[in-house]
């Protein structure tokens, strides 16, 4: 018997009468626990081990039941280090799944997998909690309309638009602007959609998580003066944590996002960095649970585990969860089972290019490599589709001509090709834009560009109306009117110098 988990404290739910078991075996992060006959916990129930180690230090380890072994024994995975645990220690069955705080109290705070704050800013209001395991929304609850999720970022909205309630893969190495792009999306969804964001750091470096937190405070995404006005909740399960924590931290972040969608009826942005680490943690646990490994040593339940997470990320009639997932590709092998399983769920891919970052074009989104299932005339309309295709054709032609330009120079090209190159260079620069979250570094105010404005701007460049303008006029501006004004200023400056 248990009290409703939605009214209980953080971490796990309270009980009227607790069932006690004892540890009979410990293998790394996996415990076998024996319970009295007829008092077996359910799969996914939280178990808590409390006691003292041999040095007299207090121990408080939460585990999750994964298997029922028979003979009144269960196998559970620990959510924190099992150092100091010994056979014979008492284990409490909490009677329900791990529950975490949800709602406005989570904004601006950092949590671990159990929903405990780890930012030293005091306790969190735990009057509303939710279990991390639940079913995906029923088919009847889903919102089946195909709608574009406008981000205000030109290159994304024009060439690889995001779907409202869709899943986007973000591919990029270190130092190409992934974090800044993530922060800009968090900022824009708060301003344009009145929504909030949840960031799930799954198996990432502690340093990166700390850097992200500091940058969010600096750029105002997390409001230090009034924490309730922050636009994001952070959930971290870092690289140094046991596989149980890394395997479940994605579900903790998703549970917080689901509350904003279902109860507050908001549009939510859910970031998972990195989805590969979720699979990797599942693989580590799978072997310890005694399952036979599948292809390349991955767990045989890979598709099921991925599906149970991804199917909960969707649009309902109340609101939407749009998910952006950083995807690490092991050894750049796209056929590896982990990325291959992830691709099956993605609606769009945003690829960040080191070459563009080296040119100083930010956001460094590769316009030719990034894709979206939304870029179809029946969804985005003929005008948007035609403009996007012509932009891609122009950039593709420029890419083909680059070898010739490098060897022979621009003068050897035909008149038509020279015009294409000039327009492509303008397009390339116009795809850059100043970000709100980068204002503190660049000094130039951020710009949110609506989709209609974006399309109009690229149509004007493609039509040839702006051929006389210098290409630097298109660099780091918002809409096309700003580029025109910048061109006029550049012309006036050059006339004054003469």
UniProtKB/Swiss-Prot annotation:
Coiled-coil region: none
Subcellular location: Plastid, Chloroplast thylakoid membrane
Membrane topology designation: Peripheral membrane protein
Pfam families: ATP-synt_ab (PF00006), ATP-synt_ab_N (PF02874), ATP-synt_VA_C (PF22919)
Binding site for ATP: 172-179
GO annotation, cellular component aspect: chloroplast thylakoid membrane; mitochondrion; proton-transporting ATP synthase complex
Primary location class: plastid
Alphabetical keyword list: ATP synthesis, ATP-binding, CF(1), Chloroplast, Hydrogen ion transport, Ion transport, Membrane, Nucleotide-binding, Plastid, Thylakoid, Translocase, Transport
EC number: 7.1.2.2
InterPro entries: AAA+_ATPase (IPR003593), ATP-synt_VA_C (IPR055190), ATP_synth_F1_bsu (IPR005722), ATPase_a/bsu_AS (IPR020003), ATPase_alpha/beta_chains (IPR050053), ATPase_F1/V1/A1_a/bsu_N (IPR004100), ATPase_F1/V1/A1_a/bsu_N_sf (IPR036121), ATPase_F1/V1/A1_a/bsu_nucl-bd (IPR000194)
Domain of life: Eukaryota
Catalysed reaction equations from the record: ATP + H2O + 4 H(+)(in) = ADP + phosphate + 5 H(+)(out)
Assembly mode: F-type ATPases have 2 components, CF(1) - the catalytic core - and CF(0) - the membrane proton channel. CF(1) has five subunits: alpha(3), beta(3), gamma(1), delta(1), epsilon(1). CF(0) has four main subunits: a(1), b(1), b'(1) and c(9-12).
General function of this protein: Produces ATP from ADP in the presence of a proton gradient across the membrane. The catalytic sites are hosted primarily by the beta subunits.
Protein name in the entry: ATP synthase subunit beta, chloroplastic
Organism whose genome encodes this protein: Montinia caryophyllacea
Gene for this chain: atpB
């Amino acid at each position: 018997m248990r009290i409703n988990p939605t009214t209980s404290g953080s971490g796990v739910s309270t009980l009227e009468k607790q069932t006690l078991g004892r540890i009979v075996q410990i293998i790394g992060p996996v415990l076998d626990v024996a319970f009295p006959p007829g008092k077996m916990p359910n799969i996914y129930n939280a178990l808590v081990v409390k006691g003292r180690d041999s040095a007299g230090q207090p121990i408080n380890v939460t585990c999750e039941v994964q298997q029922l072994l028979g003979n009144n024994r269960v196998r559970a995975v620990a959510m924190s280090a099992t150092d100091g645990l010994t056979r014979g220690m008492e284990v409490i069955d909490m009677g329900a799944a791990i529950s975490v705080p949800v709602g406005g109290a989570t904004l601006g705070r950092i949590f671990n997998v159990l929903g405990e704050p780890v930012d030293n800013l005091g306790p969190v209001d735990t009057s509303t909690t939710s279990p991390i395991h639940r079913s995906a929304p029923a088919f009847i609850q889903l919102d089946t309309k195909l709608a574009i999720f406008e981000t205000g970022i030109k290159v994304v909205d024009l060439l690889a638009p995001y779907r409202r309630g869709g899943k986007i893969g973000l591919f990029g190495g270190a130092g190409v602007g992934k974090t800044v792009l993530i922060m800009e999306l968090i900022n824009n969804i708060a301003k344009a959609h009145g929504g909030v964001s949840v960031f799930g750091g799954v198996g990432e470096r502690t340093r990166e998580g700390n850097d992200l937190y500091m940058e969010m405070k600096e750029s105002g995404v997390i409001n230090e003066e009034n924490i309730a006005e922050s636009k994001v909740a952070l959930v971290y399960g870092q690289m140094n944590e046991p596989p149980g924590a890394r395997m479940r931290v994605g579900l903790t972040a998703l549970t917080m996002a689901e509350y904003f969608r279902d109860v507050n009826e908001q549009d939510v942005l859910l970031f998972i960095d990195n989805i590969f680490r979720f699979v990797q943690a599942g693989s580590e646990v799978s072997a310890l649970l005694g399952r036979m490994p599948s292809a390349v040593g991955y767990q045989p339940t890979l598709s099921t585990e991925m599906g149970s997470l991804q199917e909960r990320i969707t649009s309902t009639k109340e609101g939407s969860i749009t998910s952006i997932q950083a995807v690490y590709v092991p050894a750049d092998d796209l056929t590896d089972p982990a990325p291959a399983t992830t691709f099956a769920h993605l609606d769009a891919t945003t690829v960040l290019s080191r070459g563009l970052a080296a040119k100083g074009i930010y956001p460094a989104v590769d316009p030719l490599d990034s894709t979206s299932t939304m870029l179809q005339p029946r969804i985005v309309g003929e005008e948007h589709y035609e403009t996007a295709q012509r932009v891609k054709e122009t950039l593709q032609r420029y890419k083909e001509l680059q070898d010739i330009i490098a060897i022979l120079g621009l003068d050897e090209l035909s008149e038509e090709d020279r015009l294409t190159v000039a327009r492509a260079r303008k397009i390339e620069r116009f795809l850059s834009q100043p970000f709100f979250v980068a204002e503190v570094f660049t000094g130039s105010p951020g710009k949110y560009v609506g989709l209609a404005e974006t399309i109009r701007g690229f149509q004007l460049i493609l039509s040839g109306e702006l051929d006389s303008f210098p290409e630097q006029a298109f660099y780091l501006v918002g809409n096309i009117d700003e580029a025109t004004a910048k061109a006029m200023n550049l012309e006036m400056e050059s006339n004054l110098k003469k």
